[in-house]
Design a protein with these regions (language model features):
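Sec/Tat signal peptide C-region and signal peptidase I cleavage site
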Residues: 23-27
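Substrate-binding cleft of extracellular glycoside hydrolase catalytic domains
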Residues: 33, 37-42, 57-144, 150
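Long, well-ordered alpha-helical scaffolding segments within enzyme catalytic domains
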Residues: 145-163
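Anion (oxyanion) recognition and catalysis
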Residues: 48, 83-84, 157, 161
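N-terminal export signals
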Residues: 2-22
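Functionally critical loop-and-helix segments that line ligand-binding/catalytic clefts
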Residues: 29-49, 174-233
Length: 233
């Protein structure tokens, strides 16, 4: 297991070890690091020792064939552990993937998934004002965006309201969502995004996937770009 914090000199602030290892942004220094993961639950001690400020956690069920996703969904004891140890929590939602991706179902799917996501968010102790990041974990064409992804996000907004919907997507899809007034928070992934580009509207940016472990669990690294990034209150 890689101990990120060991790479940072003593006395440096929380998150410095991960910041030193994460790919740099050309436009501004990140405000810290969040980890996202699905294969298990990482305790607050291990998460803090990694140098992360907190975690982006799933408020979605395991999909068929996803028995390995032992960390989905976040449960109240885990959330209490993180919160009581001063770590930040952000909610995200993704059930299907690839041919079963949630957004392929359009608005009706958005409504159904938003309802389930909110149930799990509340059950884990998520705050009423915090958003859930709905996932567009793909590189959709403009036609796919207009016919499926945008209606999917509208379904989310119909349930949660505009202010509580975040969008996990590539830079191009974030741009389209902004043009359509969809989503209040944005978490960028790099599939289909221009190399080295960070969308200026992004609150979070996923900069590394499937390369490191914390507490024996595979993690992705995300840079915090804005002071309010959808964290639970």
């Amino acid at each position: 297991m890689l101990k990120y914090a060991a790479a940072a000199p003593a006395g440096l602030g929380l998150g410095t070890g991960l910041l030193a290892l994460a790919p740099p942004r050309a436009d501004a220094a990140p405000l810290g690091i969040l980890l996202d993961y699905a294969a298990g639950v990482i305790g607050a001690g291990d998460l803090r020792a990694s140098g992360a400020l907190g975690a982006i956690r799933y408020v979605s069920d395991r999909r068929p064939g996803g028995a390995w996703m032992l960390g989905k969904p976040i449960q109240l004891p885990e959330a209490r552990d993180l919160y009581q140890n001063g770590l930040k929590i952000v909610s995200c939602y993704q059930y299907g993937k690839q041919d079963t991706a949630d957004w392929l179902g359009g608005q009706n799917a958005g409504v159904a998934h938003a309802k389930r996501g909110w149930q799990l968010h509340v059950a884990a102790g998520g705050s009423n004002g915090a958003p859930i990041y709905a996932s567009i974990d793909d590189n959709p064409s403009y036609d796919q965006y207009k016919s499926q992804a945008a209606p999917y996000l509208r379904g989310w907004e119909a349930v949660l309201g505009h202010q509580r919907v975040g969008v996990y997507a590539n830079a191009r899809t974030i741009d389209w969502a902004l043009q359509d007034g969809l989503g209040s928070y944005f978490w960028q992934h790099n599939w289909g995004s221009p190399q080295g580009f960070t969308h200026p509207a992004a609150h979070l940016h996923q900069v590394e996937i499937d390369k490191r472990n914390v507490g024996g669990i595979g993690v992705d690294i995300n840079q915090i770009l804005k002071p309010r990034f959808g964290q639970w209150d």
